[in-house]
Amino acid sequence: MIPRNFFFTILICAFNVCATFTAVATASPDCIGPFASYALFAFVTCICVCSIVCLVINFFQLVDWIFVRIAYLRHHPEYRNQNVAALLRLI
């Protein structure tokens, strides 16, 4: 089974992006000054970039987990260690 932390990380990134876009959608540019609008734009950009980086790292971890699982399952059964498999959540 795929570890739950992959799903939690994806959900946290999606929640951050959605919450940020919701906050920006309700902000009126006529009511805030130029510095505040630039600060808001920088905040939104930072959250989006951090979420994308987090998703890329999560994707690489998932690919690594799949390759480790394939390499483990290709070994002969007598060389498989159940403790290692349980530790890596491979089975």
UniProtKB/Swiss-Prot annotation:
Q: Where in the cell is it found?
A: Host endoplasmic reticulum membrane
Q: What is its main location?
A: host cell
The UniProt transmembrane annotation reads 35-60
The protein's name in its UniProt record? Early E3B 10.4 kDa protein
Superkingdom of the source species: Viruses
**Residue intervals annotated with topology Lumenal:** 23-34
Q: How does it sit in the membrane?
A: Single-pass type I membrane protein
**A Pfam family in this protein?**
Adeno_E3B
The UniProt keywords, alphabetically, are: Early protein, Host endoplasmic reticulum, Host membrane, Membrane, Signal, Transmembrane, Transmembrane helix
Q: Name one GO cellular component term.
A: host cell endoplasmic reticulum membrane
Q: What does this protein do?
A: Down-regulates the EGF receptor.
Q: Which residues lie on this side of the membrane: Cytoplasmic?
A: 61-91
The stretch of residues making up the signal peptide is 1-22
Keyword Transmembrane, does the record have it? yes
InterPro entries this protein is in? Adeno_E3B (IPR005041)
Task: Tell me if Membrane is a UniProt keyword of this record.
Answer: yes
**What family classification does the UniProt entry report for this protein?**
Belongs to the adenoviridae E3B family.
